[in-house]
């Protein structure tokens, strides 16, 4: 297996792999161990994904490395894991945007030092003014004295 295939298997639980295999096998009508790219969309929808036509074409182009017009189970796993990770990344970014808006009290699109201090104090941990300044300086990449949304995302990525 390729590195991507090994990574895909380690990302998924045994139950998920079994569930994906069951869906995959339903469409592998001749038992040859692969499905046609046409059937891919149907399988993905069964597993709760909802790819657009364009997304499907892009996925197929990426996954069908040998250009055979079919996808084997290992290629399929790699693709499903990519989709799941993209879904998760999209969700967490939305949640972070929501969080950002809550702390951007005056709605100016920035979190200033005062708002930033409130965030840190709201965690319940005691925080000194120096620590607030230090963290603020770390996050404020363009040194304008405030944290914009991109800087906020970067800070949150480093925490996770």
Swiss-Prot record:
Ca(2+) 4 binds at residues 140, 142, 144, 146, 151. InterPro entries: CALM/Myosin/TropC-like (IPR050230), EF-hand-dom_pair (IPR011992), EF_Hand_1_Ca_BS (IPR018247), EF_hand_dom (IPR002048). Ca(2+) 1 binds at residues 28, 30, 34, 39. It holds the Pfam family EF-hand_7. Skeletal muscle troponin C binds four calcium ions. Troponin is the central regulatory protein of striated muscle contraction. Tn consists of three components: Tn-I which is the inhibitor of actomyosin ATPase, Tn-T which contains the binding EF-hand for tropomyosin and Tn-C. The binding of calcium to Tn-C abolishes the inhibitory action of Tn on actin filaments. Belongs to the troponin C family. This is Troponin C, skeletal muscle.
